[in-house]
């Protein structure tokens, strides 16, 4: 698996570039996570929250990165005894926004082990403003993030409740881009599910061999439909099994019930499709 700096020799957008252009402004807005409470969905409107499911065990974990530093993450698994396929969850900004732990828990409720590695561990504790967070992120490249994710995969391999075999990956925004990159570079990935993926080079996409299922909204202000169709075209041209689902009127982050863009019907349908896809390719 190519995870070093030499992986960025091709033309395209690495993490540093992605966070310095127009996408940076969008990402800064998304990482602020300070929404008017009146615009957020009410508990009655949230149809995808499963954090209180008594059949799911979940919480923070810490694992080694290259035998040196440690990385934290959020892990969820079924409470029942057994071994279960593993799925990596890649956040677009922070793993503490509740819908990310909830995604892990939803995977566990469906019979998987979900792990969200904290690829944003470089953020200093005192980074409180969007600009401080953006500047801290600039020091962390795509290659760094992929190494963090690989450390998470290695950690999962040591757990007695994780089934041997291929791993799935679900990513959001920048995490969707990283999900595509994993599908391109890792032989361990058997299913890739990007939600409104960030800019990914055509050369990177052209190497993806794993089955891919993409979810995005027709009203996404940061990932236009044309961009999604280009990804679809490139994947299908090389024979990668590909499914693309576009949700009418859905904006960026429509699965995130912690944001005003949450779209319950689209979120529920997208998650049903995601689980079916993962079951098909990981079991």
PLM regions: where:
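Alpha/beta-hydrolase active-site loop
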Residues: 136-158
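N-terminal twin-arginine translocation
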Residues: 12-20, 27-47
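N-terminal secretory signal peptides
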Residues: 1-13
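Short beta-strand element of the alpha/beta-hydrolase
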Residues: 84-91
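Primarily recognizes the serine-hydrolase "nucleophile elbow" in alpha/beta-hydrolase
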Residues: 151-207
């Amino acid at each position: 698996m190519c995870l070093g700096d030499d992986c960025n020799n091709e033309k395209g957008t690495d993490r540093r570039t992605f966070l310095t252009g127009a996408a940076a402004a969008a990402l800064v807005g998304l990482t602020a996570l300070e929404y008017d409470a009146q615009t957020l969905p009410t508990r009655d409107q949230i149809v995808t929250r499963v954090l209180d499911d008594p059949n799911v065990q979940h919480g923070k974990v810490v694992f080694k990165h290259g035998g040196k530093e440690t990385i934290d993450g959020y892990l969820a698994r079924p409470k029942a005894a057994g071994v279960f396929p593993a799925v990596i969850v890649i956040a677009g900004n922070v793993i503490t926004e509740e819908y990310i732990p909830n995604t892990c828990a939803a995977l566990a409720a469906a019979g998987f082990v979900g792990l969200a590695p904290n690829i944003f561990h470089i953020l200093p504790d005192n980074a409180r403003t969007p600009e401080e967070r953006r500047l801290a992120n600039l020091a962390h490249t795509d290659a760094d993030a992929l190494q963090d994710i690989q450390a998470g995969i290695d950690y999962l391999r040591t757990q007695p409740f994780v089934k041997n075999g291929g791993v799935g990956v679900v990513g959001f925004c920048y995490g969707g881009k990283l999900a595509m990159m994993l599908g391109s570079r890792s032989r361990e990935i058997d299913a890739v599910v990007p939600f409104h993926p960030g800019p990914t080079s055509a050369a990177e996409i052209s190497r993806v061999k794993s089955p891919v299922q993409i979810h995005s909204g027709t009203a996404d202000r940061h990932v236009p439909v044309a961009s999604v169709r280009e990804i679809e075209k490139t994947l299908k041209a090389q024979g990668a099994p590909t499914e693309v689902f576009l949700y009418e009127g859905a904006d960026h982050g429509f699965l995130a019930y912690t944001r005003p863009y949450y779209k319950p019907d689209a979120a529920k349908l997208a998650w049903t499709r995601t689980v079916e896809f993962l079951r098909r390719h990981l079991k």
